[in-house]
């Protein structure tokens, strides 16, 4: 096993522990608590994949961070912070919408890279909107936290979420996954639109109906994908 992979996991475990202590003192806002929950699932998946105990890794991560801080001067720390671009956290969904359990009458699940796509194929002739919580850097989608498809009545009928055991994805991965989800929902004559926030940072453009401008090649690929799986 690569030593950098292990040390990265150890540091991530310790930093999660620090953020958890911060939130437990009621100093964190909703995005902080949301990320804690999502990152906890990711760490559990990584720990299982690597065969490492999270508590032991957290202690080792603390030692690594303490050693770095001892060697780092205040001036170097200021320069590092100034040189790192800051990401923003954007929310279409409330905490309740993100944490709500939902059920599928005709479940369909597909993996697209490190993203898991789930949808209820029993849903027909509905108006559906896609909402997402994600981070943005340089005015582009950086990391998807969670995307869900809602009917006008507020029912959840689809979802895209990162796989805890496969961290890391690009904005193109997210757009491709959204294309698959839209294709699956539209197959049953549902009308799907994407939230303005998601359109702006994932595609930087959209049509008036809230439908992202998918290229013809991707449309054909989506149709073939859904047709082969139904």
UniProtKB/Swiss-Prot annotation:
Please name the InterPro entries in this protein's record. NS1, NS1A, NS1A_effect_dom-like_sf, uS15_NS1_RNA-bd_sf
Which BP terms in the Gene Ontology apply to this protein? symbiont-mediated suppression of host cytoplasmic pattern recognition receptor signaling pathway via inhibition of RIG-I activity; symbiont-mediated suppression of host gene expression; symbiont-mediated suppression of host mRNA processing; symbiont-mediated suppression of host PKR/eIFalpha signaling; symbiont-mediated suppression of host type I interferon-mediated signaling pathway
Which terms are listed as keywords in the entry?
A: Eukaryotic host gene expression shutoff by virus, Host cytoplasm, Host gene expression shutoff by virus, Host mRNA suppression by virus, Host nucleus, Host-virus interaction, Inhibition of host innate immune response by virus, Inhibition of host interferon signaling pathway by virus, Inhibition of host PKR by virus, Inhibition of host pre-mRNA processing by virus, Inhibition of host RIG-I by virus, Inhibition of host RLR pathway by virus, Interferon antiviral system evasion, RNA-binding, Ubl conjugation, Viral immunoevasion
What post-translational events are described?
A: Upon interferon induction, ISGylated via host HERC5; this results in the impairment of NS1 interaction with RNA targets due to its inability to form homodimers and to interact with host EIF2AK2/PKR.
Question: Which stretch carries the motif Nuclear localization signal?
Answer: 34-38
Per the record, its GO cellular-component terms are: host cell cytoplasm; host cell nucleus
The segments labelled RNA-binding and homodimerization in the record are 1-73
Q: Where is the stretch described as Disordered?
A: 205-230
- Which cysteine pairs are covalently linked by disulfides here? none
Chain span(s) of sequence motif Nuclear export signal: 137-146
The subcellular localization recorded is: Host nucleus; Host cytoplasm
- Segments carrying the region annotation (PABPN1-binding) are 223-230
- Any one Pfam family match given in the protein's UniProt record, by short name: Flu_NS1
* Region of interest (CPSF4-binding), ranges: 180-215
A molecular-function term among this protein's GO annotations: protein serine/threonine kinase inhibitor activity
Tell me how this protein assembles.
Homodimer. Interacts with host TRIM25 (via coiled coil); this interaction specifically inhibits TRIM25 multimerization and TRIM25-mediated RIGI CARD ubiquitination. Interacts with human EIF2AK2/PKR, CPSF4, IVNS1ABP and PABPN1.
HAMAP family, from UniProt? INFV_NS1
Domain notes for this protein = The dsRNA-binding region is required for suppression of RNA silencing.
What family name appears in the similarity comment? Belongs to the influenza A viruses NS1 family.
Job description of the protein: Inhibits post-transcriptional processing of cellular pre-mRNA, by binding and inhibiting two cellular proteins that are required for the 3'-end processing of cellular pre-mRNAs: the 30 kDa cleavage and polyadenylation specificity factor/CPSF4 and the poly(A)-binding protein 2/PABPN1. In turn, unprocessed 3' end pre-mRNAs accumulate in the host nucleus and are no longer exported to the cytoplasm. Cellular protein synthesis is thereby shut off very early after virus infection.
Q: What protein does this entry describe?
A: Non-structural protein 1
Query: What organism does the record attribute this protein to?
Result: Influenza A virus (strain A/Mallard/New York/6874/1978 H3N2)
* UniProt gene name: NS
């Amino acid at each position: 096993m690569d030593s950098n992979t292990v040390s990265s996991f150890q540091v991530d475990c310790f930093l999660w522990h620090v953020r958890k202590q911060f939130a437990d003192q009621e100093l964190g806002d909703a995005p902080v608590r949301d990320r804690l929950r999502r990152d906890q699932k990711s760490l559990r998946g990584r720990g299982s994949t690597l065969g490492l105990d999270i508590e032991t890794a957290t202690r080792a991560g603390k030692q690594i961070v303490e050693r770095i801080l001892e060697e780092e001067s205040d001036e170097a720390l200021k320069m590092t912070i100034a040189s790192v671009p800051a990401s923003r956290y954007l929310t279409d969904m409330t905490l309740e919408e993100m944490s709500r359990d939902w059920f599928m009458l005709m479940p369909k699940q597909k993996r697209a890279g490190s993203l898991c796509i789930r949808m209820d194929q029993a849903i027909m002739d509905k108006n559906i909107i896609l909402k997402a919580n994600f981070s943005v850097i340089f005015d582009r989608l950086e990391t998807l936290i969670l995307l869900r498809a809602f009917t006008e009545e507020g029912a959840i009928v689809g979802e895209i979420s990162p796989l805890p055991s496969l961290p890391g994805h690009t904005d193109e991965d997210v757009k491709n996954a959204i294309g698959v989800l839209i294709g699956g929902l539209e197959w049953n004559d549902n009308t799907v639109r994407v939230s303005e926030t998601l359109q702006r940072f994932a595609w930087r453009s959209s049509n008036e109906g809230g439908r992202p401008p998918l290229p013809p090649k991707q449309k054909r690929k989506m149709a073939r994908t859904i047709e082969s799986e139904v």
